[in-house]
Structures are given as C-alpha cells and as structure tokens.
C-alpha cells in the first residue's frame, strides 16, 4: 500500500500501523476522486486515520470466522489450529463483505471506484463448512514437506513445535489440516467469484482492474508445523499467489509468469493504471510491462524481512494464557526474544539466503532442494554464493534504507525556498 519495505519506516510488528502523514494507496485513490469501498480487516492504518481511506466501510456483521474450538486445553490437538467442519450454512465475515461488495456493484457504483477486500480466510484456525470441508481427498493430496533437521533451522520453530505438542500430531492429522486449508482457499475463491460475477453483470468487467493476492502463506502441515512465524521464510510462507486482470484485452491474458515480484510492486502498478501522481519515494516496480506481455522478467532477486531486536520491548507481542491457541508461538517469542530476532531473506530463482541477527544463517539451493531441507550456509563450497547474496542484501539496504519527503522545509521564517530555474553549469 506504500511501496515501502517494513524497515523503511519501522513497520515490523502488529501494533505500529501507518501514521496519518505516511503514504497510503487507498487514501491517495480517495483523494483522486475514487469511491473507496472497504470490506475486511484492518492491518493497515491507525483507527483515527481509517475514515480518510474509505468512502464507505462494510461492518463485520457476523460472528467468528472459525466457530469454536472442538478441543480442550489438555487435548493433544488443542494447539493444532484444526477446528474442522463448520455447521452447514455457516456465515463468516468474509461472506458478509463479499456479498455487500457484489451488491454495491449491482447497484450501479459511483465512478471511478475501488473495492478493497482484505478477507480473513484462509487464515487459521483451519475450519470450513460443506461442501468445502469434504472437497479434497485427504489421501490424494500432494506430499507434505517432511520434518527437517531443526538444529539447522531457527530455534523458534522447534520451540513452537514442542510447546504445541506437534510431535504428537500424526501424518493423517496433518493431511486433515491441509485438506481443510485447501477448502478454506476454495471458499475464498467462491466468495471472490461473487464479486467478479457482479462486475461482469454490471458491464464493468472490461474497464476494471482486479488484483488478488495474499499477505503470507501457512505451514499447514509442511515441516511438521501449522502456523506461520514472522521471521521464517520458506516458500510456503513467502511465495504467495498473485492474480491480476487488467482493464480491456491484453495479449498476455490467461498467462502464468514465473517472474520474481514483490508485494511492494502492487503500489506502483495501481498508481500507473489509475494515473496517480508521484508523491513520495517508493521502491516498488510497476508490473504493467509484465502483465501486458512486453517482458518476461521483472526482478532478479526479491526480499522479505521480519523479527525484532532483543531490546525492542515495545515491539514484542502481548503474552497470552495457555488457553489461547497462539500461546505456543507467543510464549516462545517472549521467553527467548532472540529466537524471534530480526532476519532478512534474499531469493533468486536458484538460491535463497537468510541472514539472521542472532542465529545461524540459512542458504538453500532451490534448484536441487526445493523443499529447503539442507542448510548450506556454513558449507565452504558455497561461500561465494553467500558472499554474493550478502552483497545484494547490503545494496538493497543502502537503496531502501530511508525516504526523504518531496516537500522541503523552510530553514528561516520568511526565507523562500527558491528554485533552480536560473543556474550556471
């Protein structure tokens, strides 16, 4: 929403949202005359700044997205996030938000418009109603990534696994988790489909751009884990879907691209399509050339980051009681802040390198080890790869380390800033 990486302005936790003076795509669209309909959760702005980002806000209008846990705290699967089958006809906030968005389109929306739907699903706990619950044959699913050598992985993962009793979860139970996760994804497809159908029915399809993506993935059984961690970077967490439809007809319609892209690229892509002015320094790259089939490459490396400093008490997530299903991860993070320490990933098509502030680094050969099971970071034969990717990481930090506002400040009262229209070479 800004074209910034988390480190640019310190947005590295769940409790420091964008400030009113910071860039935000939704606010810029609204200022440019777009009617902005917001239906979904808020992981973006401070509450007092929310009204500046929408023209209409759809209230939640439903209960828990996941129903109630079927387990007691002492049960073996209590921390597995597996809630299972919801009652037939169960209505979630996602149903409300997408129904309202579809109705908005059928009613003849103001022009131009932007619909922003940050849905909950398929975020765990893992729960969904029929027909989605039984849609995927548990025995026909692709194999899950095996349990790795956790001594070569960040220790937060083994701490979570032990506290959540995940060693006691069977292969079939992990496959149940994955099948329900797939069902939640398919339900999300159906909910988004209602909005797309309304776009077509209202004659708006050809002149509307559509972006569908996720902010992160989940383990959902891979590596013997269930829920993401914020400073781990396996592809199941970071290689998220991105589906885009441009207005009108494009030669590349229906194509699938393996170009390396980042979520920061969303901002300049929408800004270009909407004709928004450049108001701040940002680090995304417009995807329009790739989307129009003008090029097949976009970036030669992508980055991700997460975690906190040991001494950053104000960034550590709130402690929870044992009855909270997030207790295994949050208690581990609070018991050992360095296990949740800062880390940065750089990924090319061939390699993934993770630099950790307090722990062993990671290096994976994605061509020969796509499941990221063998950490090569300390293998002397790959020292050159580590050095090359470390240099790329340093260049990235130097390039994106801060932003200077476009608007200059006066140094003395009444002193004009001047311009450079009259100058000597």
List each language-model region with its residue ranges:
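A contiguous binding-surface segment within folded domains or other stable secondary-structure elements
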Residues: 365
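Formylglycine-dependent sulfatase
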Residues: 1-351, 361, 370-391, 417-425
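Short, charged, surface-exposed hinge/linker loops at domain edges
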Residues: 404-419
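Bilobed periplasmic-binding protein-like "clamshell/Venus-flytrap" ligand-binding domains
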Residues: 36-38, 390-407
């Amino acid at each position: 929403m800004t074209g910034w990486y988390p480190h640019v302005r310190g947005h590295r936790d769940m409790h420091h949202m964008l400030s009113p003076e910071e860039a935000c795509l939704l606010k810029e669209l609204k200022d440019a005359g777009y009617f902005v309909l917001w239906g979904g959760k808020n992981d973006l702005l401070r509450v007092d700044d929310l009204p500046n980002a929408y023209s209409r806000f759809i209230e939640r209008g439903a209960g828990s997205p996941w129903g109630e846990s079927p387990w007691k705290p002492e049960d073996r699967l209590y921390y597995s996030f597996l809630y299972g089958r919801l009652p037939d006809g169960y209505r979630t906030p996602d149903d409300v938000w997408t129904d309202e968005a579809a109705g908005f389109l059928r009613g003849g929306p103001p022009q131009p418009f932007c619909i922003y739907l940050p849905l909950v699903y398929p975020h765990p706990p893992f729960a969904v109603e029929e027909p989605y619950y039984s849609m995927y044959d548990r025995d026909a699913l692709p194999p899950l990534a095996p349990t790795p050598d956790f001594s070569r992985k960040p220790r937060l993962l083994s701490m979570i696994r032990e506290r959540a009793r995940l060693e006691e979860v069977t292969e079939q139970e992990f496959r149940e988790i994955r099948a329900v996760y797939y069902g939640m994804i398919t339900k999300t497809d159906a909910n988004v489909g209602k909005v797309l159908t309304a776009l077509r029915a209202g004659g708006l399809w050809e002149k509307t751009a559509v972006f569908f993506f996720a902010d992160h993935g989940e383990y959902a059984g891979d590596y013997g884990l269930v829920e993401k961690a914020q400073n781990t970077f396996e592809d199941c967490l970071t290689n998220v879907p991105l589906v885009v439809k441009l207005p009108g007809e494009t030669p590349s319609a229906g194509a699938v691209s393996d170009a390396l892209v980042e979520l920061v690229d969303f901002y300049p892509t929408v800004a270009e399509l909407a004709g928004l002015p450049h108001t701040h320094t940002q680090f995304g790259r417009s995807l329009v050339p790739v989307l129009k089939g003008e090029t097949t490459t976009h970036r030669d490396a992508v980055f991700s980051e997460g975690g906190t400093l040991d001494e950053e008490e104000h960034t550590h997530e709130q402690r929870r009681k044992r009855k909270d299903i997030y207790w295994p991860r949050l208690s581990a993070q609070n018991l050992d802040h360095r296990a949740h320490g800062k880390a940065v990933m750089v990924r090319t098509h061939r390699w993934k390198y993770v630099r950790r502030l307090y722990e062993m680094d990671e290096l994976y050969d994605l061509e020969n080890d796509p499941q990221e099971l063998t950490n090569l970071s300390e293998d002397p034969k790959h020292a050159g790869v580590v050095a090359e990717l470390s240099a790329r990481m340093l260049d990235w930090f130097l390039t994106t380390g801060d932003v200077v506002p476009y608007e200059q400040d006066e140094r003395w009262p009444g002193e004009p800033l001047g311009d450079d229209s009259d100058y000597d070479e």
